[in-house]
Amino acid sequence: MAKKSMIAKNKRPAKFSTQAYTRCEKCGRPHSVYRKFKLCRVCFRELAYKGQIPGVTKASW
């Protein structure tokens, strides 16, 4: 879980475009964030299993 200060810092606009990085909107994790959903892989998996992300289903082939 990210500190509140880091989450607040991420919400502010960066001075330079190269300083910007993605964080999970739910838990604040900085790595493995899917840009389309703004969620990390852990949170994405939780919400997908619960059926809270529309259009996402478990793959089967």
From Swiss-Prot:
A GO molecular-function descriptor: zinc ion binding
Residues reported to bind Zn(2+): 24, 27, 40, 43
InterPro entries noted in UniProt: Ribosomal_uS14, Ribosomal_uS14_bact, Ribosomal_uS14_CS, Ribosomal_uS14_sf
GO CC terms, sorted: small ribosomal subunit
NCBIfam families (UniProt xref): PRK08061.1 (NF005974)
Family: Belongs to the universal ribosomal protein uS14 family. Zinc-binding uS14 subfamily.
HAMAP family to which the protein is assigned, alphabetical: Ribosomal_uS14_2_B
Name the UniProt record assigns to this protein: Small ribosomal subunit protein uS14
Name of the encoding gene: rpsZ
